[in-house]
Amino acid sequence: MSKSRDTEIKLFGRTITSLLDVNCYDPSSLSPVHDVSSDPSKEDSSSSSSSCSPTIGPIRVPVKKSEQESNKFKDPYILSDLNEPPKAVSEISSPRSSKNNCDQQSEITTTTTTSTTSGEKSTALKKPDKLIPCPRCESANTKFCYYNNYNVNQPRYFCRNCQRYWTAGGSMRNVPVGSGRRKNKGWPSSNHYLQVTSEDCDNNNSGTILSFGSSESSVTETGKHQSGDTAKISADSVSQENKSYQGFLPPQVMLPNNSSPWPYQWSPTGPNASFYPVPFYWGCTVPIYPTSETSSCLGKRSRDQTEGRINDTNTTITTTRARLVSESLRMNIEASKSAVWSKLPTKPEKKTQGFSLFNGFDTKGNSNRSSLVSETSHSLQANPAAMSRAMNFRESMQQ
């Protein structure tokens, strides 16, 4: 009796299932057995394709003739006929590979055709002989640069007159050539990068800021320095000079209520030279106006009342008019007086009737006070601010 069973074949790690009805007892149902190795002509072909072939060595497979054709299309790895030479795996899967080969060949042909057409176009593009005038300034001083990358019909031109690029059939660029400061250094359009110094300004009338004459706000000198010459800082002359500096801010701005723009009396009185083309005047200071008569700060005492001042000749000078004396100028005078008094062996016998900064130097029988006068006068005469604070402190201690 014949028995049917399923057999599994493993080739190269892959299982192949097939229905093989094998009847070992019925010799009539078996097909003649073919020996692959018996034919010497086919042995060479089998040995050459043994690396890719699923069959290794001579195989004896008894198969029915009726099932031979039915199992032919089930799996490509099953040999359909032993009479034919075995095929490789690449040859079995030939439909897909043939399609890929066709696609590759078509791509190669398209690339060759495009390369030939591009070569023809590149040879066809030539520099135009006719120059197009600039549409902006209508000058004929133009230059052909190159063809547009996207459209061959729009070449790029450059105008040497107005320094602009434009494309034929397109819009013109309003941006000049270059990237700002590096390219525009030699062009007249780069004047806004220049910095105007004080030498470029018209300083012909700058000498009239200081004028000499008598005024209510004049700076007077007392003692040895009292002569007929007085220096005046006029605000009207400063306001008249604003017309000569066109394009700049005024060097001094007058504030309302006679207030000073600087909060401290030792601040610099001139403007910054890097912003305003106005030279410094180190000998002149801005007058400080008094805020109240009872103020205890230095440099802000009113002089409306008549006061008695003593100079080196011990003669009193009465002032009937209100005068504003510069603080730094007064400090220099008083420092020179203190230096002269410290060198003298005796102190002045008379005391000032009015309020004076040098009441602290008057001796009251204390021997240490005389030594302090000689020491502080030499050490503090270089710094008027520190000397005035020390004197004010001593006056307050005596009171």
Swiss-Prot record:
Where this protein primarily resides, as one coarse class? nucleus
- Compositionally biased residues, Basic and acidic residues: 36-45, 64-75
Q: What spans are recorded as compositionally biased (Low complexity)?
A: 109-118
| Keyword Thylakoid attributed | no
Subcellular localization: Nucleus
Q: What happens when the gene is disrupted?
A: Early flowering.
Extract the Pfam families matched here: Zn_ribbon_Dof
Q: What induces it?
A: Circadian-regulation. Highly expressed at the beginning of the light period, then decreases, reaching a minimum between 16 and 29 hours after dawn before rising again at the end of the day.
- PROSITE patterns referenced in this protein's UniProt entry, alphabetically: ZF_DOF_1, ZF_DOF_2
The entry marks the following residues as binding Zn(2+), namely 134, 137, 159, 162
Q: Which InterPro entries match?
A: Dof, Znf_Dof
Gene Ontology CC: one annotated term: nucleus
Q: What biological function has been recorded for the protein in this entry?
A: Transcription factor that binds specifically to a 5'-AA[AG]G-3' consensus core sequence. Regulates a photoperiodic flowering response. Transcriptional repressor of 'CONSTANS' expression.
Q: What is this protein called?
A: Cyclic dof factor 5
